[in-house]
C-alpha cells in the first residue's frame, strides 16, 4: 500500500483508499498487475469460525523512521465521524477514508510528512500490522501540505 496525497493548509481534506494483498502467495510473481491483488477484509470470520475486526490508526510522523515523533494521530473505525476523523466505509473490501483536518494542517505547517497506518485489534487497539512502505521503490507513504 502506498499513499501520496496533498492537502491544503487551512482546509479539511478527506481521502479514500483500500488495502489490497497479493492473492497468490505460493507463486513467485516478478511483475504484479491489478488482477494479482484482492481486498484485505477489515472484519470477518476466520477459518476457525472466530470473528475478527480491525480498526485503523492513521499517523502523520515527523520523520521517515520507526521511532519518529507522531505529529497527528486519528483512530478510524466503522463508527468514527467521516467528516473529521475518517471511517471504515467497506470493511469486507478493506476500504476506508481518512481526513487531514484544518487543525492537523495548522499543527503540521507546510511540507511533506511520512504516513503510518496501523491495523489494530478493534477491541484492544493492540497493533497487528503496520503499513508504512509502498510504491515501486518501497518509499514511505506521505502527505504534502500546501498553501494555495
Feature-to-residue mapping (PLM):
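Contiguous segments within soluble domain cores/interaction surfaces
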Residues: 1-148
